[in-house]
Swiss-Prot record:
E.C. number(s) listed in UniProt: 3.1.21.-
Pfam families: TatD_DNase (PF01026)
Function description: Exhibits 3'-exonuclease activities and apurinic/apyrimidinic (AP) endonuclease (in vitro). Show preferential AP endonuclease activity on double-stranded DNA substrates and 3'- exonuclease activity on single-stranded DNA.
Protein name (database record): Putative deoxyribonuclease tatdn3
GO MF annotation terms: metal ion binding; nuclease activity
Gene: tatdn3
Superkingdom classification of source: Eukaryota
Organism from which the protein derives: Danio rerio
SUPFAM superfamilies linked to this entry: Metallo-dependent hydrolases
Mechanisms controlling activity: The 3'-exonuclease activity is sensitive to the metal ion present in the active site, whereas the AP endodeoxyribonuclease activity is observed in a variety of divalent metal cofactors. 3'-exoxonuclease activity is suppressed in the presence of Ca(2+), Zn(2+) and Ni(2+).
Record field: transmembrane: none
Cofactor binding annotation: Binds 2 Zn(2+) per subunit. Exhibits AP endonuclease and 3'-exonuclease activities in the presence of Mg(2+) and Mn(2+). In contrast, in the presence of Ca(2+), shows AP endonuclease activity exclusively.
Amino acid sequence: MARGFIDCHCHISASEFTTDTDDVLLRAKKAGVKALVAVTEGASEFEKVIQLSKTYPGFVFPCFGIHPLQGSGQDLHSVRVQDLDPFLYLFQTYKDDIVAIGEIGLDFTPWYSSITQERDEQMKVFIKQLEISKELDLPVNVHSRSSAKVTIATMKELGIRQALLHNFAGKPSVAMEGVQAGFCFSFPPAVSKNEQRAKLIRQIPLEHVCLETDSPALGLDKHVRNEPSNVTISCEYIAKVKGISSDVVMEVTTQNALRLFSKLKI
């Protein structure tokens, strides 16, 4: 197996990368990144992420998913069923191309989903996409802000076996429920400034940890665009917290990623 990193959760189809995708991916390769798992937040990105996977074959691996929050800026709102239903056919159309269903999940942050109706709608969209993942035999790439316990419980209820909980911020006891279910957890560079997250990372076995950047967001400086090349920062931080070498973290997390995303061929 080639030595190197896998960025298990990034948004390379985001508008922030439109003008210099080549340069961004070249920097990633120079940093030792061997593959990007490219998630989407909405159906408007589906065709773009497929095109990127064809432009950069064997490096950009596409996922389809509808995020629990839709829109942007002042228009950011909790997802609705109509954000998913008209695009369900695309999951079937591109089932051979996509390597996972994501980014999907729940976001119960009070200012985005303050009422039961919004949370119920999110749950419907989440469950529909979990069912798609089972039908297509694909792993899920999952968001769980302010909803860690219910997110893990829902996946367990539906019999999900292959899941990545990205930028996980739940309690260690909740994380261990995910570990027992066989799920993996990934952490972006921004967590290196968070002592609570260090406690969490210490408790999760390395065999259940993956690397991610969540780029263009969640870099060390929130005012600077994050990039896949910064997956090295996540690796070094996890190594420091666990008291092991960066090489061991790189090797084990890459093995974990290849096991989780079985369609990745690097």
